[in-house]
Design a protein with these regions (language model features):
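Short beta-strand elements of solenoid repeat domains
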Residues: 1-2, 6-11, 15-18, 24-29, ...
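Intrinsically disordered, highly charged
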Residues: 1-12, 68, 148-159
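GD-rich hexapeptide-repeat beta-solenoids
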Residues: 13, 20, 91-105
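Feature marks extracellular polysaccharide-active and adherence modules
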Residues: 19, 49, 65-66, 78, ...
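Short, surface-exposed beta-strand-loop junctions and turns on beta-sheet-rich folds
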Residues: 54, 71, 92-94, 121-123
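Acidic glycine-/aspartate-rich tracts in secreted/extracellular proteins
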Residues: 68-70, 79-94, 129
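Low-complexity acidic/polar repeat-biased segments
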Residues: 104-159
C-alpha cells in the first residue's frame, strides 16, 4: 500500500519495491512517501522510490533508481565490492539522451556522497563507501523493458 512502509526481505534473494503507482505512461513513477527497504541476507533486488531509505544488508544487492525520484533516496550501506547501482533513464522521446551521472561529496553532510542524475539528486550515500562512477550502470527504459527489469514495477511491495 502507498504510504510510509517498512519492507524487510529477510534471508534469501528478495525483491523489494519502494514505488507506488507503478508505471506512468511509458515509465515508472512514484507518488509514494518515504519507505524503509531492508534486504536482509541474500542477493536482493531493491527498487527505490523517492525519499526511501535503503539498507541492502548482507549479500550482493542490486539497487535500482531512476528519473522517477524527485526526492533523493538514502542508501546507508552500499558496498561497491558486492553491491551494484543501476540507474534507469527515460528514452521514450526520440531526442532523449542519457543523462549525466555525477558522484560528489555532499557539501552539507560530511561523510555522505550525492549521486546526481541530470539536474536531480537521486541518492544520498552514507557510510564508509568509496562509491565512484565505475560502480554505477546506466540503462535506458526501453532496454530495461526488453530485459523485463521493469516488470516488478507493476506490483509494489515485497516479493
Amino acid at each position: 500500500d502507498a504510504g510510509v512502509d517498512s519492507l524487510f526481505g529477510g534471508a534469501g534473494n528478495d525483491t523489494l519495491i519502494g514505488l507506488a503507482a507503478g508505471m506512468d505512461g511509458d515509465g515508472p513513477s512514484d507518488t509514494d512517501t518515504a519507505d524503509f527497504l531492508n534486504g536482509g541476507g541474500g542477493d536482493d533486488l531493491i527498487i527505490a522510490g523517492q525519499d526511501d531509505v535503503v539498507h541492502g544488508g548482507s549479500g550482493a544487492d542490486q539497487l535500482v533508481l531512476g528519473e522517477w525520484i524527485t526526492q533523493a533516496a538514502s542508501i546507508i550501506d552500499f558496498e561497491p565490492e558486492e553491491d551494484s547501482l543501476l540507474f534507469i533513464w527515460d528514452d521514450s522521446n526520440a531526442q532523449s539522451e542519457p543523462p549525466d551521472v555525477v558522484v560528489q561529496a555532499d557539501p552539507e553532510n560530511e561523510g555522505q556522497l550525492q549521486v546526481w542524475m541530470g539536474d536531480q539528486i537521486v541518492a544520498q550515500v552514507s557510510g564508509p563507501s568509496q562509491l565512484d562512477m565505475a560502480d554505477i550502470s546506466l540503462i535506458s527504459l526501453s532496454s530495461a523493458k526488453a530485459l523485463e527489469l521493469v516488470q516488478p514495477f507493476a506490483s509494489p511491495g515485497a516479493q
